[in-house]
From Swiss-Prot:
Gene that this polypeptide is encoded by: EIF4E
Region of interest called EIF4EBP1/2/3 binding, as start-end residue ranges on this chain: 37-40, 73-77, 132-139
Taxonomic placement: Eukaryota, Metazoa, Chordata, Craniata, Vertebrata
Quaternary structure and interacting proteins, as annotated: eIF4F is a multi-subunit complex, the composition of which varies with external and internal environmental conditions. It is composed of at least EIF4A, EIF4E and EIF4G1/EIF4G3. EIF4E is also known to interact with other partners. Interacts with EIF4ENIF1/4E-T; promotes recruitment to P-bodies and import into the nucleus.
UniProt-recorded name of the protein: Eukaryotic translation initiation factor 4E
List of residues that carry Phosphoserine: S209
GO cellular component: cytoplasm; cytoplasmic stress granule; cytosol; eukaryotic translation initiation factor 4F complex; nuclear body; nuclear speck; nucleus; P-body
Summary of the function given for this chain in its UniProt record: Acts in the cytoplasm to initiate and regulate protein synthesis and is required in the nucleus for export of a subset of mRNAs from the nucleus to the cytoplasm which promotes processes such as RNA capping, processing and splicing. Component of the protein complex eIF4F, which is involved in the recognition of the mRNA cap, ATP-dependent unwinding of 5'-terminal secondary structure and recruitment of mRNA to the ribosome.
Length: 217
């Protein structure tokens, strides 16, 4: 005679342990949370402190290099704002391999778009303008002409501060003027404010306190 097997109730699975929960959560973690966002170029931040007992090059110090968005912000949030630097100090941000001096191979035929600030603008505009300048550089904001950009410098001075973007070839009118127009727009400068581009060679051989502008926007 056939026998009927008694029905069995499936045994419920035990609740997951904390370890299993953690493993499960890790599997679905958003990779955006731990993958850094690479920049197109590697950049070097330099600091200059004017000590008259030392040579110019001895006063120039490399702070750090970075090539991701996250590493840039970690560095920027760690250092002093430009407005807090002592007069005579500079920050320079240049593509890795280019030193922040006229004599560098990439700079010697170039020039700079120069922003001059009065003393009152140190508190109102200096830090904002410098950050926007840096973001223009690392974000490659100058379209097809970003390769012409070498770096940027902020000079903190008692008489008035300066910010400049350096380009590699002062004779390249198309690249230089495009960079100048984009830069002026990014800083939010009104049309009546004119900024000028000066070659490093003219700056080095100037007679008097001013250097003639090759281009203006």
């Amino acid at each position: 005679m056939a026998t009927v097997e008694p029905e069995t109730t499936p045994t419920p699975n035990p609740p997951p342990t904390e370890e299993e929960k953690t493993e499960s959560n890790q599997e679905v973690a958003n990779p955006e949370h731990y993958i850094k966002h690479p920049l197109q170029n590697r950049w070097a931040l330099w600091f200059f402190k004017n000590d008259k007992s030392k040579t110019w090059q001895a006063n120039l110090r490399l702070i750090s290099k970075f090539d991701t968005v996250e590493d840039f912000w970690a560095l920027y949030n760690h250092i002093q704002l430009s407005s807090n630097l002592m007069p005579g100090c500079d920050y320079s941000l240049f593509k890795d391999g280019i030193e922040p001096m006229w004599e560098d191979e990439k700079n010697k035929r170039g020039g700079r778009w120069l922003i001059t600030l009065n003393k009152q603008q140190r508190r109102s505009d200096l830090d904002r303008f410098w950050l926007e300048t840096v973001l223009c550089l690392i974000g490659e904001s100058f379209d097809d002409y970003s390769d012409d950009v070498c770096g940027a410098v902020v000079n903190v001075r008692a008489k008035g501060d300066k910010i400049a973007i350096w380009t590699t070839e002062c004779e390249n009118r198309e690249a230089v003027t495009h960079i100048g127009r984009v830069y002026k727009e990014r800083l939010g400068l009104p049309p009546k404010i004119v900024i000028g581009y000066q070659s490093h060679a003219d700056t080095a051989t100037k007679s008097g306190s001013t250097t003639k502008n090759r281009f203006v926007v």
